[in-house]
Amino acid sequence: MSIRYIDEIENLSGKKLFMRVDFNVPLDDNQNITEDTRIRAVLPSINYALDQKAKIILASHLGRPKGERKEKYSMAPAAKRLSRLLGKEVKLASDCIGDEVKAMINAMQPGDVIMLENVRFYAGEEKNDADFAKALANDCDVYVNDAFAVSHRAHASVEAITNCFPVVAAGFLMKNEMNYFEKAMKNPIRPLVAILGGAKVSGKIEVLENLCDKVDKIIIGGGMAFTFLKGMGYNVGKSLVEDNLIDTAMKTYEKARAQGVKFYLPVDCVVADQFNPAAETKVCPIQEIPEGWMALDVGPATVTLFTEALQNAKTIVWNGPMGVFEMDAFSRGTFAMVSAVANSYALTIVGGGDTDVAVHRAGEYAKISYISTGGGAFLELLEGKKLPGIKVLEDKGHL
């Protein structure tokens, strides 16, 4: 069944529209937002609903308050920033459920926007509790999910709440996320290349197993590469290795090779004598990692190899950095890959999280076709899983 989108709902005028957004944005010590991409990402849906004269009730979480009210996790900074971006008042409710909130919603005029307080102030949110979901729905008329980044969570404001509405739909951000994912994984223009990085194989092994059936090339960088390299018999010193996953990693490698997938691993690396920005470093081939040293970035020969592997790519999907790019000494590999991906002639899709941060830092944001707002959600799609938040929209949101 197909998902219904916000622009397919008839007559939103005067309707109370409950929209789940993801305003889980980073804050500094003074509660100032340091990066507002997630807020900007849902402006198209909010502005559409405003144009349709809907009454908009926004719900989000921020941080991990673990079912308790903690003021440092208040949605106040997000409401303030959204107010500035929309050029109109966004009222912050004192809570997300209760009589006071209900009265506030009932007093709304068409075109008003209310931001509910953090839904994770209640344990019922993460427990997907039906009673909490009903209280949260507050007799609203329409439910819209535009929070892709939390759609892999079976939480009350994402899944259970859909049972409280006659009409459920997805917003434009969700539409973008699904469209680009389908372009990459369902109907890709080939060759399709997947780049996977990050520290641990354990976080990506299911992704790898799923991608073996779909991609033409797999490029592995970051700490996770060293579990594969140790499995191939290399001495990797003190580099990060998940010994319990060596067999699994090698089976996945063999599966990819058997299916004709080209599999690229680092041929050299930047090693350090300790995990420290001021550590002594040097570049060495994979075969010559010194005893007691650890690899913290891919080396220049690897960058050349990986860049050449991207030369003929028509679709590139990337999740996970090539090294510990937060430290300058180990950032060159990741930034070189950002440049290679950004300057390719392919459709380029970058998964959220660290890779998103690296692309921003490298100043290549505008050259990437699409940067996903979801880290975990993006990974679960790559694993071939149905996300709970999307499944309920498919089940209940058909026209």
Swiss-Prot record:
Residue ranges annotated as coiled coil are: none
| SUPFAM superfamilies, A to Z | Phosphoglycerate kinase (SSF53748)
Q: Which reaction does it catalyse?
A: (2R)-3-phosphoglycerate + ATP = (2R)-3-phospho-glyceroyl phosphate + ADP
KW Nucleotide-binding (keyword) present: yes
Q: What is its EC number?
A: 2.7.2.3
Keywords from UniProt, A to Z, are: ATP-binding, Cytoplasm, Glycolysis, Kinase, Nucleotide-binding, Transferase
The domain of life for this entry's organism is Bacteria
* Complex formation: Monomer.
Matching entries from HAMAP family are given as: Phosphoglyc_kinase
What is the protein's given name?
A: Phosphoglycerate kinase
Q: Which organism is it from?
A: Geobacter sp. (strain M21)
